[in-house]
Amino acid sequence: MTKWSPNSWRAKPIQQVPAYPDQAALAETEARLATFPPLVFAGEARKLKKQLASVAAGDAFLLQGGDCAESFAEHGADNIRDFFRVFLQMSVVLTFAGSQPVVKIGRIAGQFAKPRSSDNEVKDGVTLPSYRGDIINGTAFDTASRTPDPARQEMAYRQSAATLNLLRAFAQGGYANLENVHQWMLGFVADSPQGERYEALANRITETMDFMSAVGITSETNYALRETDFYTSHEALLLGYEEALTRVDSTSGDWYATSGHMIWIGDRTRQPDHAHIEYCRGIKNPLGLKCGPSLTADGLLELIDLLNPENEPGRLTLIARFGADKVGEHLPRLIRAVKKEGRNVVWSCDPMHGNTITAAGYKTRPFDRILREVQSFFEVHRAEGTHPGGIHIEMTGNNVTECTGGARAITAEELQDRYHTHCDPRLNADQAIELAFLVSELLKKNSGASEKKVVNG
């Protein structure tokens, strides 16, 4: 295999690359980015890899979620806070039900670029480049907005830095206090039309919290109850940006992507001899690989060999995204191939991307299909004797109407009320927490540990 360097991907074929008209400006932007401070640090990525190794071993569960694509317009403290608040509630529910730690990774502070099925979009006879995310171009359908602009990469970097700064403060500064999260969760249960279904679990958490307080285990006496580990992730799509933020770790001499703790490769860019695999194989961060219906068992093993040749636990997360009706057809063959070859991986379920439909003129995802894909994921793993390691969802902390269904039974006609996404439909705050409660039932059934309680929000 050829020697790897941060720019060796440039000699490979590449998919999903924007056509920048001003290549000199692009090179200047990338050169400036290469002088900027790293957004994350190698030690943090190593810590995440160690926690993901616990997931691979069946001793923890992965919760990964966030925006389909972050936007410059919606960047604000309230949006970040609301997302983090919902994410923490989901984590506590999953932790308690599964009697396992939950590894928390956001699709945030870098999730700006999106792959598209077509390079161009046509409206009223006018053809313009497709919107590829705010890091590349704008949503407005005019030439100026849709022309890829390198300056947007620096805007994305600065927004990521500001977002990370706030997330670190939330995670370590007391906002993640388990007592706070517990009270938020009780509010959700009280307000939910399905609250009675979730009340038993909520009451058990309350009893456990009361017991811990009675014996002196509180957020004041135990830092683990007021702080939490939270990591960032995004799809590594815009490789010039990723290369500029690829740095050598001074303690190990290894290369790390410092744009996020974990990065993943999309279903459209996983060709083994192409640029995205080439870039990702050389960095030491934890990696994700989206696995869709077209991926063969042999193709998956080839990619695992390229991305995790040392079979390192926690290095590679396989993110299955088939669609609710196709899990039983595709997932077992991949699990069997990986299991037969003894490969160490985390199996995660993306129940979003295979379940997109159009209703009332809007792209949407029915909640029942999302849940059904997760249920099928758990059923297949139970049958194969493997660990259903996590879920990977697109969500927001806001009260949007983008996915139909859920406890509040959002209809296709109601999608227009608060349809705010810049890209694909997201679960709203209530739907995301509801999904966590429903997944918690699957975890409890999977673990069989009804009495053992672990609280590690």
Where are the regions a protein language model picked out?
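Glycine-rich, charged/polar anion/phosphate-binding loops
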Residues: K47-K49, D273-H276, L303, P332-L334
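Intrinsic-disorder/low-complexity, polar/charged segments
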Residues: A19-D22, A73, N428
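N-terminal basic/disordered segments at the start of proteins
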Residues: M1-F61
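A general structural signal for short secondary-structure junctions and capping/turn motifs
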Residues: L52-V55, V93-T95, Y279-C280, V380-E384
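Short loop/turn segments at strand-loop or loop-helix junctions that form parts
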Residues: L63-C68, I105-I108, C349-M352, E394-T396
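Active-site-facing alpha/beta catalytic cores
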Residues: E70, A77-G323, R365, E373-V374, ...
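Basic/polar N-terminal segments that are highly enriched at the extreme N-terminus
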Residues: M1-K3, A449-G457
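Non-transmembrane, aqueous-exposed alpha-helical and coiled segments at domain scale
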Residues: A297-P309, R315-W347, H353-E402, V454-N456
